[in-house]
Amino acid sequence: MVDVANIHLPVLLDDCVNLMAPALEHENAIAVDCTLGLAGHSIAFLKAAPQARLIGIDRDSEALGLATERMEREGLADRFIPVHAAFDQLDQVLADQDIERVDAVFMDLGLSSLQIDETDRGFSYSHDAPLDMRMDVSQPLTAERILATYDAAELVRIFKEYGEERFSRQIARAIVARRDKEPFTTTAQLNRLVDEVVPQAHRPAGNPAKRVFQALRIEVNGELDKLASTLPQAANRLHVGGRLVVESYHSLEDKTVKSFMAQGLRVDVPAGLPVIPPDAQPFFTDLTRGAIKADEHEIAANPRSASVRLRAVEVSREIPSRWRKRFTQTAQGLNDVKIQGSASPGRAKNTARIRTRRG
């Protein structure tokens, strides 16, 4: 049995609770944790907000089961609804629950400790494992398949775009040249190749393959495209006074979150107008004044928190209809949002329903 208490350390837990709890103080408040993992954050949210209910979404069925067991042990199961889905299915999840609006949405975009510490999915370059990298093992696309089928140009694209890898072209060419003789099936093989290609003098701190692993994981799971689709869904589902709280762990995620939130933090008129119409005023309030980072004490206790950036906004007024329409189009991939990587699970699966609504 997995000892979840030892492998899951929620990052910036107190900060996240302090940001979420004010939106959950009223009766029948509803929160959504789009990245449930092992429920470390969600358990704290429910304990801090005894009137709230929480929908926990995760595409990893193993994590979902373990999180549900934790909720039962904590006596919180009656206020918890587990849903097997990808987080970009947020609209569908809420529709299935007959919920129009919610009070808080949380996203922790890092890999769960369970996924990192399990050696059979290939998320970590520290262990030899199959090149899988799927968060949802029912999905068809794996890292092995990418390395076997993508041409050099496609590999260069994902290594450069998703890994910000300086030697993307050289690594891609080496993979294509070698794979016919030696198919890439394990993380050790990929580690060795990157080690051979990247010059010693130009290596980042840590394992030289970490950017390549990141790029493959993002491509396999469609992470950035799902994030770009989910953020506008979340905004459109929040009550006035509702909060969107997001933890990201690499610059591409943080840029996506920061850019999305900035849309609602600025005045929506051309510069120089003498009077700003009420409908053009910002509809978000910045709750974190930029990003909150882990301090040295948290990093010492949990090294995986070193790269975290926590951002949060509150919906300060009703989002204008033109922005709601724009957000809906973005969520559907109609505003230059690329949808790549693996498909989402066909339909959200849940075992319970929330029957109370906000009055």
From Swiss-Prot:
UniProt keyword list: Cytoplasm, Methyltransferase, rRNA processing, S-adenosyl-L-methionine, Transferase
Signal sequence annotation: none
Region (Disordered): 339-359
Gene Ontology BP term (one): rRNA base methylation
Protein localization: Cytoplasm
Keyword GTP-binding annotated: no
GO terms for cellular component: cytoplasm
Molecular functions per Gene Ontology: rRNA (cytosine-N4-)-methyltransferase activity
Record-listed S-adenosyl-L-methionine binding positions: A39, G40, H41, D58, F87, D108, Q115
Alphabetized SUPFAM superfamilies for the sequence: Putative methyltransferase TM0872, insert domain (SSF81799), S-adenosyl-L-methionine-dependent methyltransferases (SSF53335)
Enzyme Commission number, as recorded: 2.1.1.199
Catalytic activity: cytidine(1402) in 16S rRNA + S-adenosyl-L-methionine = N(4)-methylcytidine(1402) in 16S rRNA + S-adenosyl-L-homocysteine + H(+)
HAMAP family: 16SrRNA_methyltr_H
Protein purpose: Specifically methylates the N4 position of cytidine in position 1402 (C1402) of 16S rRNA.
Protein name (Swiss-Prot/TrEMBL): Ribosomal RNA small subunit methyltransferase H
